Amino acid sequence: GCSTVVDGIFGPATEVAVEKFQGQHKLKVSGVVDSTTQTALLSPIAAVQLPISPGSQSLAELTVAYARQHLAQHPIEIGGQNCGPWVRLYMSGKEGAEWPWCAGFATWVLRQACRTLKVAMPHPYAFGCDSLASAAQSAKRLLRTKTAADLAAVQPGFLFLVRKTKTSWEHIGIVEDIQNQVLTTIEGNTNDSGSAEGFEVCRRTRSALDK
């Protein structure tokens, strides 16, 4: 691949990585990040920001559509825990170990859908699970799924929270589908094992109960 260690120095390894990237994308191979190469490097981030025609889609349906648009570009951390251009996009420029970005991702996607439909956000754009849970509870939008009967109200496009303690939450994502008490989700700051401190946006399968 084209990956190399991010150390803040444009050295020989970075130059070779740029040359590989240019070759793979059928650009002039120079090892120099010119404007054409920069545009190609940033194209995945540009792609997730393209507007989706809403048609007759509801806010929930459009939220799922935007989440899939992000998933297709496979956003990942680069240069350390909770670091890189994707994290900065979702976190309004913030990055670093102290900035988990699952909430930033979920509410950034929700905001995209709201702006497309020109409607107010049902939840604030936020960086913390606890603050989102508190806002949802105050607005009487926090649904507790302790029994199978509770799941009848859950729809694709909803945000879900993973509980840490009785009074706090540690992770959030977007419900893509729900079938037979099982959620298919699209989440940021996770990985295939379901970590709340993962490194990517990915699709996961989770129990729908006790969320």
For the regions a protein language model found, what residue spans apply to each?
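...with weaker cross-activation on analogous glycine-rich loops/strands in unrelated enzymes
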Residues: 13, 57-64, 116-195
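N-terminal capping segments
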Residues: 38-119
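Low-complexity, Gly/Ser/Thr/Pro-rich intrinsically disordered linker/tail segments
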Residues: 198-211
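Soluble non-cytosolic domains of exported or imported proteins
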Residues: 8-13, 31-35, 57-61, 96-104, ...
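Terminal peptide-recognition signature
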Residues: 18, 102, 106, 157
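Short acidic, glycine/serine/threonine-rich helix-capping segments at coil-helix boundaries
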Residues: 1-43
